[in-house]
């Protein structure tokens, strides 16, 4: 596959277990997401190890800081050679624009820069608790519009928001969707969920899937089934 849609979320606290899983799957069938836990435990060397094995990596560290600090972190991700990196859109337009600008020298080799809108675990009551009175969907659209204006390539959003965002922000604006569970999977701690085929039909470009693949006895088979359902 030239542009695999599935991004497998690696959530391991043991390096040997993570690499044992990775060695069961084919880099042409998916990409890999490295988040805060694994990056804190194993650092950039783990990402390099995945690159050596032929995988594209989404570095999911959700940077959120003053523009200068955030942009330098994004530059460090570009130096590491990752395929995608993200920042919190709630950091504001100046922070996002600085992060996008610092990637200019990398040209076509630069990572995709993605904004994080509303975490998929958050519901209206959670937003109200931090003083945001808008409905989740309205707040997502506001933050995603800000991200597009700042020059970002796309946003992380739930599948429920995908069609709305494509409609408002255009086909080229990439939508990365977590909270994806193949039919029959456990819901876990993601509140707003959909199956892979439903999410792609709704406008998602990339699907983040974790435990249904990483905890499967035969992850390569599960990946094949998911990819087949997207054709």
Curated annotation (Swiss-Prot):
Offer one example of a GO biological process linked to this entry.
'de novo' UMP biosynthetic process
Supply the PROSITE patterns for this chain.
OMPDECASE
Q: Which reaction does it catalyse?
A: orotidine 5'-phosphate + H(+) = UMP + CO2
Q: Where does substrate bind?
A: 11, 33, 60-69, 120, 181, 190, 210-211
The record's annotation in InterPro entries points to: Aldolase_TIM, OMPdecase, OMPdecase_AS, OMPdecase_bac, OMPdeCOase_dom, RibuloseP-bd_barrel
**Which pathway does UniProt place it in?**
Pyrimidine metabolism; UMP biosynthesis via de novo pathway; UMP from orotate: step 2/2
**Which Enzyme Commission numbers does its entry carry?**
4.1.1.23
The cross-references to CDD domains, in alphabetical order and at most eight, read: OMP_decarboxylase_like
UniProt-annotated catalytic positions:
62
Q: What Gene Ontology molecular function terms does this protein carry?
A: orotidine-5'-phosphate decarboxylase activity
The cellular component terms of Gene Ontology attached to this UniProt record, alphabetical and capped at eight, are: cytosol
Q: Which UniProt keywords apply?
A: Decarboxylase, Lyase, Pyrimidine biosynthesis
Does the keyword field hold Ubl conjugation? no
Task: Note whether Kinase occurs among the keywords.
Answer: no
* Family that this chain belongs to: Belongs to the OMP decarboxylase family. Type 1 subfamily.
The task this protein performs is described as: Catalyzes the decarboxylation of orotidine 5'-monophosphate (OMP) to uridine 5'-monophosphate (UMP).
Assembly and oligomerization: Homodimer.
Protein known as? Orotidine 5'-phosphate decarboxylase
């Amino acid at each position: 596959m030239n542009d695999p849609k599935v991004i497998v979320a690696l959530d391991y606290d043991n390096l040997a277990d993570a690499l044992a899983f990775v060695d069961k799957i084919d880099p042409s069938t998916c990409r890999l997401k490295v988040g805060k836990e694994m990056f804190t435990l194993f650092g950039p060397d783990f990402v390099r190890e995945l690159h050596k094995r032929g995988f594209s990596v989404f570095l999911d560290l959700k940077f959120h800081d003053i523009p200068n600090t955030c942009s330098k972190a994004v530059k460090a991700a570009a130096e590491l050679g990752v395929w995608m990196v993200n920042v919190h859109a709630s950091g504001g337009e100046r922070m996002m624009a600085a992060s996008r600008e610092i990637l200019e020298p990398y040209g076509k080799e630069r990572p995709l820069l993605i904004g994080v809108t509303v975490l998929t675990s958050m519901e209206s009551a959670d937003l109200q608790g931090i003083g945001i009175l808008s409905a989740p969907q309205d707040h997502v659209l506001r933050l995603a519009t800000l991200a597009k204006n700042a020059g970002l390539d796309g946003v992380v959003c739930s599948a429920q928001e995908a069609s709305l965002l494509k409609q408002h922000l255009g086909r080229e604006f990439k939508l990365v969707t977590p909270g994806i569970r193949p039919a029959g999977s456990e819901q876990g701690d993601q509140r707003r969920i959909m199956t892979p085929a439903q999410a792609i039909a709704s406008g998602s470009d990339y699907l983040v899937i974790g435990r249904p693949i990483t905890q499967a006895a035969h992850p390569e088979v599960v990946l094949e089934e998911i990819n087949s359902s997207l054709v």
